[in-house]
Structures are given as C-alpha cells and as structure tokens.
Amino acid sequence: MINKIGVLTSGGDSPGMNAAIRSVVRAGLSEGLEIYGISDGYQGLYQDRMRKLDRYSVSDIINRGGTFLGSARFQEFREEAIRAIALNNMSKYGLGALVVIGGDGSYMGAKLLTEMGLPCIGLPGTIDNDVAGTDYTIGYFTALETVVEAIDRLRDTSTSHQRISIVEVMGRYCGDLTMAAAIAGGCEFIVLPEVEFQPEDLVYEIKASIAQGKKHAIVAITEYICNVFELALYIEKETGRETRATVLGHIQRGGNPVAYDRILASRMGAYSIELLLQGYRGRCVGVQNERLVHHDIADVIQNMKRPFRRDFLETARKLF
C-alpha cells in the first residue's frame, strides 16, 4: 500500500506546473498520504534533495509561472546505475510512488523507473503541446497567449514601416503553437515542421501578396526549421521589402498561467493521485474531448503519434 508519494518537474518548465504540484500535494493529503517534493527533477532525485510538503508549502503558487520545485535536464538518468541510486534515495523516505510533470523526455524517465519497480504517473507539462495521448499539455494555452500578444505588437510596427516580420515560435517538431498563434494573430504566412518548406515558395507567395497591394506581412515559423535571420535576408533580397526576424525564445515559457492551464493542471494532478491509489503504474494522464484519460506511458512514447491538426491548417490557409 502506498503511503508516501514524490512529485517532481522535469525538462523545460511550463506555466501551470505549480498548479499541478499544488494539486498533487493537496489531493494526496486529502487521501491521508504524505507528499515529498523533489528539487530540480531527476537530478534532485539522484542527489537526494527531497522535502516533505504540506498544504501550506503550496499556498499562493497556483497563479505563479515556472516551478517552485525547480527543473533540470539530466541525461545521466538514462544510466541504470544512476537510477538505482535515485531509487535508493527514495526508499530512505519510504516513497512508494512518483508523479512526474514534464514532456516526453520526462516520461522516458518515468517509464524506466516503472520498469525498475517504482509506480509512476506522468503529467504532460510543456508549452510545445507535442505529447501524444492528450489534446493539450499544461502550459500550452498560456504560451499561446504570450505568442499572440507578441504577434500583435509586431503587427503594429510592421504596419507602420510596411515591413515583413518573421516570428519564430517554440514547439520543437510540433507546429501546434505556431499554427494556433498564426490563426489568432492573423499572420499572413505560416511555416510548420509538418509541412514541407521551400524558401522560394514562400517568396513567391509574398510577391503575389505584394502584387495584390499588401503593404506588410507576418510570417509565423516553428523553431528548428531554418535560420530565421538568413531567411529574412533572403526574403528582403528577393522582394525588395524590408524584412526582420524576431525569435521569441524563452519568454514563451514564462508568465502567470491562464485560467485554463490552472484548471487543466489541477484536474490532472488530482487524477494522478486517484490512479496511484487504484493501483495503476506506468501511466500518463491526458485530456481528450475535455475528459481525463490515461494511457500506458511506454505506448505513448514508442507507438502513439500526435495527430497533425490539418483542420487548423486549412482554416489558416482560407483566412490568410
């Protein structure tokens, strides 16, 4: 029987992680469990940096961005000897299960620990919205608001100077954040990792819009597709229109979480406690059609593919 549970945040931070931690702690306490917070993700687990949390430990954090437990990337956790030390550290405190909040890399750590005998539940915490098994991840909607606000501001100056603006959005190899922000921000052009991209095709479309009288434009592009500063030089050379690139960077990860992320994180955190008490292990929580679901974490990592929102792309193309 599980009496004590650990909780950690791992990988890149996302707004709403604090709300998820708060939910895990308070839902666990309501079931008579003891909850321990682990600092700086799997690194803290390995370094034995854990502390007992009570309901006051998580007071006034639901509205705060980031993660008060801290987060880190710890590639060494792939090594079985490192994980064995982490498990031994957990046993010192009598921890019988672990809730992991993070992206697919964090899920991999939870999968490996489960295979070594520790029941783990994963919660999807990333602004990239690139985790399979869930419609939305914790932090995605807050990041979306941040990106749209940036696009709105870029539009003001692009209009004033009759300029082409390129805005690079996070997302790794998932275009959800870029696509949704482009629709909400009224971007004229969109470049996604899921769709083949040729710079000359983009230039052709920009020239066509200029020929139709368009004075300015905003191009939304997901990170890692190309060097956006080189792309800006190429567009300016080919079109004769001043072009500037803006990389939003880590500002997208910060800020107070919006209401939906707080609600989503709270629901998922409480659900993780339910699953552990019901005997589940090696599962990850998601929300699909607004209903909480859970999947085998190994299946999510290895087999499940996140569907591309082609309906969003079609909408975007009609409106641009």
Curated annotation (Swiss-Prot):
Binding-site positions, Mg(2+): 104
GO biological process, one term: fructose 6-phosphate metabolic process
Pfam annotation, one family: PFK
Domain of life: Bacteria
Catalytic reaction equation(s): beta-D-fructose 6-phosphate + ATP = beta-D-fructose 1,6-bisphosphate + ADP + H(+)
Keyword annotations from UniProtKB, A to Z: Allosteric enzyme, ATP-binding, Cytoplasm, Glycolysis, Kinase, Magnesium, Metal-binding, Nucleotide-binding, Transferase
Pathway in which the depicted protein is active: Carbohydrate degradation; glycolysis; D-glyceraldehyde 3-phosphate and glycerone phosphate from D-glucose: step 3/4
Active-site residues, Swiss-Prot/TrEMBL: 128
Amino acids binding substrate: 126-128, 163, 170-172, 223, 244, 250-253
Residues the record lists as binding ADP: 22-26, 55-60, 155, 186-188, 214-216
Principal localisation: cytoplasm
Subcellular localization(s) per the UniProt record: Cytoplasm
GO cellular component: 6-phosphofructokinase complex
Cofactor: Mg(2+)
Activity control summary: Allosterically activated by ADP and other diphosphonucleosides, and allosterically inhibited by phosphoenolpyruvate.
E.C. designation(s): 2.7.1.11
GO molecular function: 6-phosphofructokinase activity; AMP binding; ATP binding; fructose-6-phosphate binding; identical protein binding; metal ion binding; monosaccharide binding
Residues binding ATP: 12, 73-74, 103-106
Quaternary structure annotation from Swiss-Prot or TrEMBL: Homotetramer.
Function of the protein: Catalyzes the phosphorylation of D-fructose 6-phosphate to fructose 1,6-bisphosphate by ATP, the first committing step of glycolysis.
Family: Belongs to the phosphofructokinase type A (PFKA) family. ATP-dependent PFK group I subfamily. Prokaryotic clade 'B1' sub-subfamily.
Protein name, UniProt field: ATP-dependent 6-phosphofructokinase
Species name: Baumannia cicadellinicola subsp. Homalodisca coagulata
